[in-house]
Amino acid sequence: DLKVYFKQKSPKLLSFKPGILKAVDQVSFSIEKGKTFGLVGESGSGKSTIGKAILRYHKPTGGEIFYEGTEIGAMGEKELLPYRKKMQSVFQDPYSSLDPSHTVQDIICEPMAIHKMYTPKERKERAKELIRVVGLKEQDLLKYPHEFSGGQRQRISIARALSVQPEFVVCDEPISALDVSLQAQIVQMLQDLQEKYGLTYLFISHQLQVVQKICDEIGVLYLGNLMEIADADKLYSNPLHPYTKMLISSI
């Protein structure tokens, strides 16, 4: 029953009762290890807020978040550190999430340094391995983010996420900023990486065709509430909730 509420600033000069925005309200779901759970819904439905709450970028207002049976929703930052290594993210805009003053090598190595993994030399070797895994070249490690296309930058973001050997990755609209020609490539790569490393994904998107392709199970969100959960194929062949039917009919 996850809840994430935000206080809204009143447009009035003086107000004694600030409004409450219920970004996520009593949402419950689970993700099977090694599988992909999709969250779909229109803009403002609360999809990204849920992803950020799971990663603890937002502190939940209520409810619990369990990771392999351990409740992490109320943990302090020190307790969370080992879980931050296990849980990584890939966001919509790869350029804004990559430090423009750092080389690709520095970007990929930084999470490993934060979590005190490997020696500096081993980090560089791992960066070489990962840059090849995501389809780029070793010489790209010495370049800067502005020297790459959007699709290439997203590949760098994925390499960075993989650097600390995570088990769970939140993919928050990872392809929506890319050209259609590149979207299928990134989706296929995410599937290949899942099979290679045994990853578990939360895949957040408003693109229903993509979610159907990559996800095992899908939850449909509307204004912070979960309308329906079903296996991907079943959801598209036999949607039950009127809102789900409306979303699918708009494809």
Spans of model-derived segments:
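The feature captures the beta-strand-to-loop junction immediately N-terminal to the Walker
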Residues: 40-41
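Conserved ABC transporter NBD signature motif
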Residues: 63-71
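Conserved ABC ATPase "signature" region
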Residues: 71, 122-139, 248-249
